[in-house]
Amino acid sequence: MTASLLSGKPLAKLIQQQAQTEAKVLAEEGTCPTLAVVVATEDSSTHWYVRSIERAAEAAGINCRIIDVGHDATEQVLIAVLKDLSAELSVNGIILQTPLPPGVRTQELVKYIAPEKDIDGANPLSLGLLAVGERAFAPATARAVVEILDHFEIPVAGRNVVVVGRSTVVGKPLSLLLLQKDATTTVCHSKSGALGTYTKTADVVVVAAGRTGLLTGADVSEHSVVIDVGTNVLSDGSLTGDVDEASVRPVAAALTPVPGGVGSVTTALLLLHTAEAAREQSRATSAPVLTR
């Protein structure tokens, strides 16, 4: 048995088309959806990723502004930039791209992203709204996992789903989204002990821990659907996930590839969220700007 590959590219294309359609309608109404991406690093892989967002946005008819504040930017500088973007009417969506300079606190900075422009669900207020089932943008990667499961008609209601990783970017918000879909959700982390104890009996395993080869074939069963969220850059520049594909694919029922899986859907959702944010803001029904 060899696991079916769940490519994210066809789904990403569909979502990009949705974003493009909405952007076109907005443009006809006099609104050009605009995404601002704040960068504060010299990391080449980060700049490559940001450029890929810029290209995808251009193709969808969404304006993308890259604000590079430099790798030595202070927390105060970044706060000022985020405040300005949150107040700027022409900006509809804001992303604070990591990594950030040493000593800069990500969780402090994201509080200054206006919730109605928080298209990657970074502000803790967005996570809080998500927790109580209120309308808010979920982190794009977390939503991408759910969209993939829906696209391939993989049911989660009443099923055992294990999420490996508890970050505020993927693990925590994803567990909330899965609970909303009535999944029986378990979140594993560095203190959980032997991973296979939890994953081997799971119907769906989502791995988002940032560790190459964390999940192996010994940790899954023949009915497991494995979603690999990991994006790890190897010394040769190639990209790999958190799953040891060589050992997992002969065992599991289905597996998302890296690259070409969750990542492509994530980028498409950032564009769709931007278009949706622009629509909400054009109706003047968005939440008030968070101030401090």
Curated annotation (Swiss-Prot):
It catalyses: (6R)-5,10-methylene-5,6,7,8-tetrahydrofolate + NADP(+) = (6R)-5,10-methenyltetrahydrofolate + NADPH; (6R)-5,10-methenyltetrahydrofolate + H2O = (6R)-10-formyltetrahydrofolate + H(+). Keywords: Amino-acid biosynthesis, Histidine biosynthesis, Hydrolase, Methionine biosynthesis, Multifunctional enzyme, NADP, One-carbon metabolism, Oxidoreductase, Purine biosynthesis. InterPro entries: Aminoacid_DH-like_N_sf (IPR046346), NAD(P)-bd_dom_sf (IPR036291), THF_DH/CycHdrlase (IPR000672), THF_DH/CycHdrlase_cat_dom (IPR020630), THF_DH/CycHdrlase_NAD-bd_dom (IPR020631). Pfam families: THF_DHG_CYH, THF_DHG_CYH_C. Pathway: One-carbon metabolism; tetrahydrofolate interconversion. GO terms for biological process: L-histidine biosynthetic process; methionine biosynthetic process; purine nucleotide biosynthetic process; tetrahydrofolate interconversion. NADP(+) binds at residues 165-167, 190, 231. It comes from the Bacteria. SUPFAM superfamilies: Aminoacid dehydrogenase-like, N-terminal domain, NAD(P)-binding Rossmann-fold domains. Homodimer. Catalyzes the oxidation of 5,10-methylenetetrahydrofolate to 5,10-methenyltetrahydrofolate and then the hydrolysis of 5,10-methenyltetrahydrofolate to 10-formyltetrahydrofolate. This is Bifunctional protein FolD.
